[in-house]
């Protein structure tokens, strides 16, 4: 078998001379920090979305034609509904595995959006968007917005009461746009709301157009990551010109494949054990049945919250009236613009035009970190405001009061979050500098000859002639704060949950770790030697 594979490989290489290029690519090194797996959750969620979506398209009809339901769900028998809602019910109750696949599709959509958001937060707070990766930041923003549009269209397709209310709100916001509102509404909905072409257009966009664009952007995103090399956190042996981690074969490919299977398993468990978007409890869309308690999915809830807390300000220009819903669209547009343009805004203010492959700790960039926390607080306040009617109902308070709580909170809390975060970052910086200057606190108290009590510190570097630690420069890497971080606590034992490894196996592990340590030390010495040679520093 191996000879046959070798023969096939030789035949391919003789025609395309791909061996040398493939060898270089499979030797690519990936960092091992856990936060780099956040983007992979989004990737695997999108793959699951494609697979489950293909299955759902086999049984779903997006027609808005009215029919009388006569199916497995008895409470709705004899009720007039659209063909789209009927096929969604049939898919849930009569197609084998249909409900499981539909719920897995919905959970994967939520996971896709949440993982993309958290992934972008990691990129923002660590400065991974800086030059030369501005293009990837823009691609990520476009992916986030396309994911929101794709999800909104997806849960609008069943034509249930909740999705219909969401579409009606979106229709009103689009119509409130000056000049282009009417034309944009016609382009999206195909006429007045609801129109006969509405779901057909959503279906084409949801199944063909937007997934194709997302797939192309993901490919471009991964290609840029591969070509520009991966960022990494500062640490021993890590520079702007190298990457420390594991090779793609065999370690990384095994880790990422296992992580993909875990993602698939978690989504399958969620789909099988928890119910989501139970459209049979909502009934078909009926404009006369619109009520409170109508919230979209979590990634769109902030837009609903903006519509709820925005004052009803109407703008009159001559004989034209701009409705209050326009300000909601304007606010969303401003937030989107700030998100996309932030790398260029920061570059303009700081004047930083250098290439960056090493990441930053959030505490080292307090202004950016504080702005990020401020934006997160603003987003969560809008999200909570999207459910202000539920808060008012369950806590028996005035809905008007809850609306004003959201308005005042949006003005007061984000600046407060900025101030608190900024002070926390400065405090963490002082904590790092204190350890670098004085050493790690040991908890040992020593009595001086004059009767004073002082705490003994463990220096991180050399000491002067008086025994005082020599202050060390901060290199952007985590600073050890406890003696266990330096290995004083020893290493944990090896073995299973209940039994340790035997002595011979433990000795073998220790020997391997010692060899790896010697190899790592030799690598660091060679790296230091090469760096000094490049800088023109002579060896001692």
Curated annotation (Swiss-Prot):
GO terms for biological process: respiratory electron transport chain. SUPFAM superfamilies: Transmembrane di-heme cytochromes. It comes from the Bacteria. It is found in: Cell membrane. Its cofactor is heme. It catalyses: a quinol + 2 Fe(III)-[cytochrome c](out) = a quinone + 2 Fe(II)-[cytochrome c](out) + 2 H(+)(out). Its EC number is 7.1.1.8. Keywords: Cell membrane, Electron transport, Heme, Iron, Membrane, Metal-binding, Respiratory chain, Translocase, Transmembrane, Transmembrane helix, Transport. The keyword ATP-binding does not apply. Its main location: membrane. Binds 2 heme groups non-covalently per subunit. It is a multi-pass membrane protein. GO terms for molecular function: metal ion binding; ubiquinol-cytochrome-c reductase activity. Gene3D superfamilies: Cytochrome Bc1 Complex, Chain C (1.20.810.10). Heme 1 binds at residues 105, 206. One of its GO terms (cellular component) is plasma membrane. The chain crosses the membrane at residues 40-60, 109-129, 137-157, 169-189, 207-227, 259-279, 325-345, 371-391, 408-428. Heme 2 binds at residues 119, 221. The cytochrome bc1 complex is composed of a cytochrome b (QcrB), the Rieske protein iron-sulfur (QcrA) and a diheme cytochrome c (QcrC) subunit. Cytochrome b subunit of the cytochrome bc1 complex, an essential component of the respiratory electron transport chain required for ATP synthesis. The bc1 complex catalyzes the oxidation of menaquinol and the reduction of cytochrome c in the respiratory chain. The bc1 complex operates through a Q-cycle mechanism that couples electron transfer to generation of the proton gradient that drives ATP synthesis. Belongs to the cytochrome b family. This is Cytochrome bc1 complex cytochrome b subunit. It comes from Corynebacterium diphtheriae (strain ATCC 700971 / NCTC 13129 / Biotype gravis).
